[in-house]
Amino acid sequence: MTEVATVKAATPHNTKGDLFSSFNVEDFEIPRGRDEEWRFISLRRLRGLHNGEFAPATTSDVTVEIPADAESASHEVVAKDDARLGRAGAPVDRVAAQAWTSKEQGNVVTFAKNSHNPTPVTITVTGKGEGVTSFGAISIEVEAGADAIVALRYVGSGTHADNVEFIVGDNARLTVITDTHWNDDAVHLSNQLAQLGRDATLRHTVATFGGEVVRIVPRVRFTAPGGDAEMLGVYFADDGQYFEQRLLVDHAVPNCRSNVLYKGALQGDKNSDKPDARTCWVGDVLIRSNAHGTDTYEANRSLVLTEGARADAIPNLEIETGQIVGAGHAATVGRFDDEHVFYLQARGIPAEEARRLIVRGFFNEVINKVPVDSIREELDNRVSSELAVLGM
């Protein structure tokens, strides 16, 4: 007997930049494993975030540290319906909409017009542990002419989903480092939406080393000419870990620039009973018909260090106009280049040290772009700690 399933028709859209969006979780179908947006992740590992069967909801634990040399930075805990939340756009998937619907409050960090804030403001989200599910919303606004650095850190254990938005005003500059430094039993799904004004600059870095399942979905929208977005990422997955990065850069106006570079590594232990390490990177860049003068490039590189680990990489570039400066994309998944190891060995460097140098050099292309010395050093140390597991 053939079983026929009745499926609600998808909301029509022309491009990935026009996906159906809503703040109401009930407007989304429950994801299925064969859905394009969810086909790589194991829905069983999401602890009910995707279908509403999660542990009791609770407010997220958020602390904000503003340094003394910040010229004009403020933090407010606001009501869930505060008008400053959600300005960058509505969720485009059910988990993000669940986080929006279930949150009890939000956090708003504002950098005033023309202010100079050279030291990072640190936002720390701490997991609430077992038996509950935390939901949150964070809005970071850099007003016109201001510059700011934000370190967004996730630590501890638990199940967490949130919406984070970045409003970057005209001639403003924001550098943000998202560091998912969870314990290895955490599950975290995050939507991160950025809205850039005229001649605005965003430097967005995601570092993913901790957590059991971590899915980060950054989306960038240019609203006026002259915008510049650099999207960087580093990740290192071990047995039992699944990391997914799924991003979109939407060039909807003329004369904007974007550069995307993510690098990751995976390793495992043949004696482990945990699932093999797995990562997924999906990078979408959309150049709309009126986005003349666009200059964009995206790349993902993954190193598989042991048998069994798996990395998926899918770059997508959609171009609706030929009047651009340049556009390109690339993705590679590979192992050590033995020729590089032999080259270093020929110069007296032992094989294990040679491999360590190659991997650290691989990551340094991204890590060295982080403008905060302490964060850059911490990320480099984490790579070294991961390699120590392999005896490198």
Residue ranges and their predicted role:
Residues G86-I349, F363, I367-M392:
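Conserved beta-strand/loop scaffold segments within soluble protein domains that form the structured core
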Residues M1-T101, Q105-N107, A112-K113, N117, ...:
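N-terminal amphipathic, basic helical "cap/leader" segment at the start of enzyme domains
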